[in-house]
Amino acid sequence: MAKSFFGTDGIRGTVNTESLNSEIALKLGLAAGKIFTRGNHKHRVLIGKDTRISGYMLESALESGFTSSGMDVFLTGPIPTPAVAHLTQALRADLGVMITASHNTYEDNGFKLFGPDGYKLTDEKQTEINELMNRSDIMSLQDKNQIGAARRVDDALSRYIEFAKASFPNSMRLDHLKIVLDCANGAAYKVAPMIFWELGADVIVIGDKPNGRNINQDCGSTKTKALRKKVKDENADLGIAFDGDGDRLAIIDENGDQVNGDHLLAMIALSLKKKNLLKNNKVVSTIMANLSLENYLDSIDLKLIRANVGDRYVIEEMLNSGSNFGGEPSGHLIINDFSTTGDAIISSLQVLSLMIEENKSISNLTNLFPLISQKHYEHISDDKKDISNSHLENLSKEMKEKIGNEGRVIIRKSGTEPLIRVMIETNNQNLSNEILDAVSYTHLTLPTKA
């Protein structure tokens, strides 16, 4: 039976297990290399990575696969995922690969793949690569005269720094703003402080000392306790946390409170609408976006379009609907005028420009509407395939009937981790507890998400 290597966001797994190892990296390089060397021009692939210790091992295997297939390889070293998307376009590469497991801890790693246009590869293209990776003749190699070469891109960081700064209005500076950055000991640890410092901010940095094993460890966009404390201790204007690969953010206001992702989406959408910059009056988010966001956008004559969970699906729906703004409540924000993928640095610069334009604190800017209560639960499953899609669909249908018009229930498999995720959205807490109990009786033991 053919193995499925890809999830909802490329390939991801625990390093040196059957889910992710050097052999898989080599096969990926060989398979993708065969597909992206079609045509007569000299073919290039750009490879970036975050700061995980396994990145060296996987980079070497991936490089070997690509050069064996006849592609020249550009190596950037540690760099944010959106920088890989940008540089793939800028260097006229056929393909870009980011070695990362995003917000996961160092034991995991993976690959995100970008086409020559800077957008993540489609499901169809990933399926084509997956099929080649499963073939017995995957090791058929190019002629010795067609082997590719590899080189370092020494100015990769400086190229991305200038690209990100170009998204910030030329007439603005960040003078008089004190900002705390949490770089998650990840891919943004060099570029993020430099960008904000060059734009004039008083920058305080934590999570900027990666050692290969501390990426996302009690830091970053999913673990903001240290950043929230630092913002209060330093009396800062705000805090910004990035995840391990720099495509996702969390914002901490001047009071040390984390800004809800739905409020961030609403704030930016409102600003774009006021400036007549929001295309087709549409905002794209996911099925996880709060119902109160949809109601608020409707009240200002904007339409919320919901996509499946995952920033690549948000981007696909943005392109299909003609919208130039979308994102996930989890912190992936995409402004298509600036970037082809989620970019935490560029998104945070847009938040800062709004603060300066409106002369308001971030807490005032995001105080737009009350949220409907959402509770999130997770069931850890070593093999999600043990729980059938039909079982989850039937369970979801049953729970939706139970909650009726008082809210929403979403039960789904995570596309990047061995988890079944449950979201219950209602202000009726008794009903929420009843639904959780009912779900638990279906043989899913669901610990509360920390």
Predicted segment positions?
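Conserved small/polar residues in nucleotide/adenosyl-binding loops
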Residues: T442-T448
